[in-house]
Amino acid sequence: KKRLKLRIGATKTIGDYVLIDAIKDYLGSPSHELSLIVDNTKHLLQMLDENQLDFAVIEGTFSKTKYDFYLLRMEPFVGICAKDSPLCGRHLAMEDLLKETIIVREEGSGTRRIFEERLMASGYALNDFTREVSISSFVSIKALVAGGVGISFLYQSVVANEESIGTFTVDGITEPHPFHVVYTRNTNAKNYAQQFLGSDANETHCEKQFR
C-alpha cells in the first residue's frame, strides 16, 4: 500500500501540547508517516517557502495575502500561579499583579510577543513588574510557578492537567488567541492538513480568484 508521509511544522506550544492526539490518530494507520518540526513562526514560514513543509500550525503572525490558511481554533490564554496563591481563580486588574515576579519566555517566543503586545495595549510593560525572569523552557516555567516563585501567562493547553498550578484572568490580557494552519498556494496541503487535523475547522482561509 502506498505510504503517505506528511511534513508538518508547528510552533512550540502547538507542537509540544496541541498536536499529540492528532499525531497518535494519524499514525494509527500503518501507511502513514510524518516528520514534525517544532520551531518559531519565522523559520517555519521560510521552510514553507522552500517546500520543506506541507503545512505549518502556528500561533504567530503571517502574511494573509501570501499564504492560504484556515483557523484551527481559538486557544484560551491564561494567567498562571501556584495553586495555593491568593491570585488563584480570580479575575484581576493588572495593578494587582505588578508586585509579582513575572516569568516569561525568551525573546522571539510567540507566547512572549502576544503577552508583551497585550501589556502595551493596556498601558504596561514587563519592567513595570517587581522582577522579570526569562526562561525558554515551559517545563521550567511551570515548575517555578508551581513553587511560588512568580506568575506567568501561557496558553491553556500548556497547563492542562497541572494539579499544582492555578489560573486567573485579566481584562485585555487573557483573551483567546487564534491558532492557524498555514500553507502555500496552489498545493494539496489543505486536504493533507484536514486529513491530519480533521475537516471540521473553521473555513477562514484566503481564496483568491486566480486559484
Tell me what each language-model feature is:
Residues 2-64:
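Central regulatory/effector-binding core of bacterial HTH transcription factors
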Residues 5-9, 56, 80, 103, ...:
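Short, well-ordered beta-strand segments
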Residues 18, 169-210:
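A late-sequence structural motif
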Residues 22-29, 112-128:
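Ligand-binding cleft/hinge of the Venus flytrap
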Residues 40-45, 49-52, 58-59, 120-168:
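Hydrophobic hinge/microswitch elements
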Residues 66-103, 107, 191-193:
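Flexible hinge/capping segments at coil-to-helix
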Residues 68-78, 156, 163-178:
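Short beta-strand->loop
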Residues 102-123, 190, 207:
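Secondary-structure junction motif
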